[in-house]
Amino acid sequence: LFENCSWSPDFSDHRKWCLPGETAARDRLHQFVTRVVDKYDHDRDYPDVEGTSRLSPYLAAGVLSPRQCLAEITALQGNGQLPDFATGAGSWLNELIWRDFYSHVMVAFPRVSKGLPFQLITEKVKRRYDEKQLQAWQQGLTGYPIIDAAMR
């Protein structure tokens, strides 16, 4: 796979990426919250920096819970309050909330993962696909003041 590449990936420390066990998971959470989370909203998009939590395996396996993550984030705040969602910590917490929400959606409404609607009664609703109307909506130029104001 990599013989035609000008670089050679080094997988020698791949076992260190996700150490097993609850202690390792808690340590990773603490490291993320104390060292990385402040810049998460920016750095998460750059694979060349350590900008993500790397907690997905622990969350997926149930080794860490979203509640534990929330407790660590609120402890970081020092006042027991939720972080401002415009910060790195708030951005990460928001994504964690959506992750948890959609895992519940998939359990309760598995048909959604197959392209079907939440409410089956709406399945036969005819959809309009009008590029001009879509662009007007995206630009806040629908002619409906409340909609246009929200889009701008």
Regions from the language model: what does each represent?
Residues 1-122, 128:
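Glycine/tryptophan-enriched, flexible segments
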Residues 123-135, 139:
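Flexible, P/S/T/G-rich "lid" or insertion loops adjacent to the active sites of thioester-utilizing
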Residues 135-152:
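Helix-hairpin-helix/helix-loop-helix acidic hairpins
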